[in-house]
Amino acid sequence: MVKVIASSLRKGNVVDKDGKLYVILFAENIHPGKGTPVTQLDMRRIGDGVKVSERYRTTEQVERAYVEEREHTFLYADGEGFHFMNPETYDQVAVSEAVVGDAAPYLQEGMPVQVSQFNGIAISLVLPQRATFEVVETEPTTKGQTASSSYKPAVLSNGVRTAVPPHIAPGTRVVVMTADGSYVERAKD
């Protein structure tokens, strides 16, 4: 364990609080006009998945645990969880649904994913920033609508709802951000 100041903590870091380990889901440094700057952390306890919010003064010392980060390839999902393989050692890791969380719909077979492990237990994962999916359902474009920069609702092949430009039709492959499902561009493949 290493002591660090609270303002240096980021998403994915593991901290020791009262003898229990927590993975940081969200970290924000807040500088009010009056008063002491603070770091707001949303964390999930490793082991039972309880979510906790904490506030630390930005200069306060916090125990950060060493986490091993390795690239893995997503294989499949089943009743036991989501299965990933280390491409160097061919070791497989099962990751629980609680750890995968909102990233589940964006996982595609063969997708490279950063898996963070603490003492051999997967505690968090980071997807690539962008992923490509097919549009399965969207409204038809009405004449004259193409000149405006308005977006229309669409459903992707992974079930995620997003907004796409009017020229996108069902069957078109699009690139979306895995963080929020927002449209980036039409796929070039």
Curated annotation (Swiss-Prot):
GO MF annotation list: translation elongation factor activity
Pfam families hit by this protein: EFP, EFP_N, Elong-fact-P_C
Subcellular location as annotated: Cytoplasm
A GO cellular component annotation in the UniProt record: cytoplasm
Chief site of localization: cytoplasm
CDD domains xref list: S1_EF-P_repeat_1, S1_EF-P_repeat_2
Annotated keywords: Cytoplasm, Elongation factor, Protein biosynthesis
NCBIfam families: efp, PRK00529.1
Function description: Involved in peptide bond synthesis. Stimulates efficient translation and peptide-bond synthesis on native or reconstituted 70S ribosomes in vitro. Probably functions indirectly by altering the affinity of the ribosome for aminoacyl-tRNA, thus increasing their reactivity as acceptors for peptidyl transferase.
Protein name in UniProt: Elongation factor P 2
Species whose genome carries this gene: Mesorhizobium japonicum (strain LMG 29417 / CECT 9101 / MAFF 303099) (Mesorhizobium loti (strain MAFF 303099))
